[in-house]
């Protein structure tokens, strides 16, 4: 799903680092997976991969399954992790992360 954007080895390392429930940190994950240093274009491409229902927003249910977009065998985020992730990215308070909010979150 992320071929041409992210390296498989980086994805594997990023997933390994947050294997245990409660250890997911979006900033650390973005850095490890190599997203932080990507172009605005690649960051937007990643958004559209994560936006599974193609609504133009990443909603709470998509955030919960965020890691599984990177690898089908990955765990779901805990409710606390999901809510913290949403709160960090949802700057306008509409309950979802839009593409501009996503770009700002990745670069934060």
UniProtKB/Swiss-Prot annotation:
Q: Which GO terms describe its cellular component?
A: cytoplasm
Pfam families for the chain: EF-hand_7
The entry marks the following residues as binding Ca(2+) 2, namely: 90, 92, 94, 96, 101
Q: Where does Ca(2+) 1 bind?
A: 51, 53, 55, 57, 59, 62
**MF annotations from Gene Ontology:** calcium ion binding
Alphabetized UniProt keyword annotations: Acetylation, Allergen, Calcium, Metal-binding, Muscle protein, Repeat
List-wise, which residues carry N-acetylalanine? Answer: 1
InterPro entries noted in UniProt: EF-hand-dom_pair (IPR011992), EF_Hand_1_Ca_BS (IPR018247), EF_hand_dom (IPR002048), Parvalbumin (IPR008080)
* Lineage: superkingdom: Eukaryota
Q: What else is known?
A: Is regarded as an important allergen. On the 2D-gel the determined pI of this protein is: 4.20, its MW is: 11.38 kDa.
Q: What does this protein do?
A: In muscle, parvalbumin is thought to be involved in relaxation after contraction. It binds two calcium ions.
Report the PANTHER family cross-referenced here.
PARVALBUMIN (PTHR11653:SF12), PARVALBUMIN ALPHA (PTHR11653)
| Protein name per Swiss-Prot or TrEMBL | Parvalbumin beta 2
State the species of origin: Merluccius capensis
